[in-house]
Amino acid sequence: MNVVFAVKQYISKMIEDSGPGMKVLLMDKETTGIVSMVYTQSEILQKEVYLFERIDSQNREIMKHLKAICFLRPTKENVDSLIQELRRPKYSIYFIYFSNVISKSDVKSLAEADEQEVVAEVQEFYGDYIAVNPHLFSLNILGCCQGRNWDPAQLSRTTQGLTALLLSLKKCPMIRYQLSSEAAKRLGECVKQVISKEYELFEFRRTEVPPLLLILDRCDDAITPLLNQWTYQAMVHELLGINNNRIDLSRVPGISKDLREVVLSAENDEFYANNMYLNFAEIGSNIKNLMEDFQKKRPKEQQKLESIADMKAFVENYPQFKKMSGTVSKHVTVVGELSRLVSERNLLEVSEVEQELACQNDHSSALQNVKRLLQNPKVTEFDAVRLVMLYALHYERHSSNSLPGLIVDLRSKGVAEKYRKLVSAVVEYGGKRVRGSDLFSPKDAVAITKQFLKGLKGVENVYTQHQPFLHETLDHLIKGKLKENLYPYLGPSTLRDRPQDIIVFVIGGATYEEALTVYNLNRTTPGVRIVLGGTTIHNTKSFLEEVLASGLHSRSRESSQATSRSASRR
């Protein structure tokens, strides 16, 4: 179950099927992102694809010497653009691939437009999602719900993305969903409808234990996306932002022109692949080793250019040398900027208190520490408000709750009103009233003992004590202990055996910390394969945008106690 491999296979098959000769790859905005996540431009160039064009680009030239490979989402706009294209074809022959199921009527319209008979084939290749890591995918949708209900357009897109994922992995799953979320049940029903309607597509070889799709809602754990991160990939996303593997470094003081935007992709960057799940401290020493390795290779290459043979050897090694030099400067810059932000924003201290708020239950200590940090001028308004949010979520119903006082402290610190208002919005979004689970207190005697012992001996790393709630959910699922009254099956059948292939989908967005949890479970649990997906991949900033987009913050307390109004059609 490797989503990067699945999408890669589709794209290389498209290119192979078009045969030898020069080609153009014709895409839309979304499929451009889908392709760029798994292939670099230079890799595709090696496959005789010399031009990359957007179907919606108005000024494309006529190039009859090129074959066109079209990879498009089956939207009305794309079908209309293709109809126009086929009426006046710019290329010699067209191989058309849709990233999802296309209706018979659309295929008929395309056939009618193809008067010059330039279409060689029309196929469905189900690469309709963003493959982030081998076990992680996203749909790049921010703001999927209105209140507690789906935005209809986003429900449709999410259903398409999730069914495409199942088809690309050749899985016809049983479905379980989070009972406390109406949105999770609704998505499950939509996926089930597609499976029933397109049953021929889902007729895969039956496995002894059927695969399982588990649909969760971000509302059940609003803590995880609010925490600072200390593993490489998660930390880069939290502090710098990752957008389709691209990192914008243009704001870094004194940045050179060629490093204003860098790409971090485990597919093409060995250092990143080996370090993405390691702690920040380890990254520092690994960067040092990388630099030393680079330094060792560098003088040797330059000293020995005495004979023609030396020069030939250097030229042969140069692409690798140049690539290594690019890798070194990229990671040194990224890690340098992370270090600068950690120090400038006092993040070690901030993160320690965040972890206390997420993992411990000592109210007076937590309150004291939050108040102390709110007085610290180095703590930014963004970090100050996130600490208050974590406090508000954890101690929402504590008898000594001091949230009003902390809001006053935020105002005294000069925190903008838009941030202060977000505190109640986050509680409205993921507070105790809407959670189907208890995020904070240990559930059983074993867990209580573990927490007690942890408290006695201290934790190995104070900055990474927190484990996402997803860890416990998946642990119970793998052991066959996930309660059916909290996570019911959709439909009458239930799974007798422990699941082996699990697809988890989080409405409202997953996080890189959860992706790390899944990576570790895959590594340490033989016979179990888990893939995680979400409407998007959040950092704190995008999560707060998600909360704002839901519109829950704008309701008065009274109306929010009533049932959320139904989603209005946009």
UniProtKB/Swiss-Prot annotation:
Tissues showing expression: Ubiquitous; expression was highest in testis and in brain. Detected in every part of the brain.
Primary location group: Golgi
Species lineage: Eukaryota, Metazoa, Chordata, Craniata, Vertebrata
Free-text function comment from the UniProt entry: May play a role in vesicle-mediated protein trafficking from the Golgi stack through the trans-Golgi network.
Modified residues (Phosphoserine): 307, 441
Topology term for the membrane: Peripheral membrane protein
Gene Ontology terms: cellular component: endosome membrane; Golgi apparatus; Golgi membrane; membrane; synaptic vesicle
Protein name as catalogued: Vacuolar protein sorting-associated protein 45
Family: Belongs to the STXBP/unc-18/SEC1 family.
SUPFAM superfamilies: Sec1/munc18-like (SM) proteins
Encoding gene per record: Vps45
Record keywords, A-Z: Endosome, Golgi apparatus, Membrane, Phosphoprotein, Protein transport, Transport
Organism, scientific name: Rattus norvegicus
Keyword Protein transport appears in the UniProt entry: yes
Subunit structure: Interacts with STX6 and ZFYVE20.
Superkingdom, natural source: Eukaryota
